[in-house]
């Protein structure tokens, strides 16, 4: 289910089509580079990302860092400039995010080397701000309920990218479209770092439902939110279907995401040399 009405999403798309010059419009050939997908969960460890990147690069691998918007300021503060940042949120830039941050402040520090992978459903105010900052913008179309019937104004059938309810998981869909097959996931906890206070546990959302949930996964118990729980379900599905999609995955972190990885970790596929060839 989309987080804003379908009409809002359609209006955002119409406004963004003329604003963005470059679009991911076709699938690319497979490459052997690695994407570090960086989400903003409590276990996000920039030092570890730097060390892992260095180690792979010493072994001759090409590593590209793609982050979600909440991880962008953390990476920039630590002088780790991401290759790309994925944006999916259709809500206005002045609003307060689910992390309790005014969205516009996430883009205070933007490097021209970072490509912003902007979903066409993103609020146009985000595109305007990025243009003001002379950022590199590349558009893409996110498949959602609102665009099941196609996208007006794109001429032929637009390439729509699937892959999850949040920008972190949708990054894997984008990467797959661009020809990447190896993804290392950081900060995908899908749960809170600690138990909320009793007062906070009583909080409810606009629909009167509890904001915070305590869920059990395997032998673990985790505090999470509805949004993070949906992400956890997407993560579980990703782990189960990774081999069918020819994905090589690594998971670095803690929380509910780490427990799901422990339970559903894809079996490592054999190389042809296992038959003595």
Can you annotate each of these PLM segments?
Residues 1-277:
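Metal-ion/cofactor- or nucleotide/acyl-coenzyme-handling active-site neighborhoods
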């Amino acid at each position: 289910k989309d987080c804003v009405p379908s009409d809002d999403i359609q209006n955002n798309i119409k406004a963004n089509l003329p604003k963005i010059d470059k679009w991911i419009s076709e699938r690319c050939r497979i490459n052997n580079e690695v994407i570090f997908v960086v989400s903003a969960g409590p276990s996000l460890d920039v030092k570890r990302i730097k060390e892992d990147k260095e180690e792979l690069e010493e072994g001759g691998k090409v590593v590209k860092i793609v982050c979600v918007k909440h991880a962008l300021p953390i990476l920039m503060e630590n002088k780790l400039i991401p290759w790309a940042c994925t944006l999916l949120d259709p809500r206005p830039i002045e609003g307060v995010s689910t992390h309790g941050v005014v969205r516009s402040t996430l883009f205070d520090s933007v490097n021209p080397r970072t490509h912003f992978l902007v979903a066409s459903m993103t609020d146009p105010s985000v595109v305007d701000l990025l243009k003001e900052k002379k950022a590199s913008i590349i558009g893409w179309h996110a498949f959602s309920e609102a665009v099941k019937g196609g996208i007006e104004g794109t001429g032929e059938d637009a390439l729509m990218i699937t892959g999850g309810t949040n920008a972190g998981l949708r990054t894997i869909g984008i990467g797959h479209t661009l020809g990447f097959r190896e993804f290392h996931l950081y900060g995908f906890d899908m749960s809170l770092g600690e138990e909320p206070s009793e007062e906070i546990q009583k909080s409810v959302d606009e629909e009167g439902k509890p904001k915070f949930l305590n869920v059990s996964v395997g032998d673990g118990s985790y505090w999470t939110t509805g949004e993070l729980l949906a992400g956890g379900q997407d993560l579980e599905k990703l782990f189960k279907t990774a081999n069918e999609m020819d994905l090589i995955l690594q998971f670095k972190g803690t929380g509910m995401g780490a427990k799901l990885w422990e339970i559903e970790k894809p079996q490592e596929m054999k190389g042809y040399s296992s038959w003595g060839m």
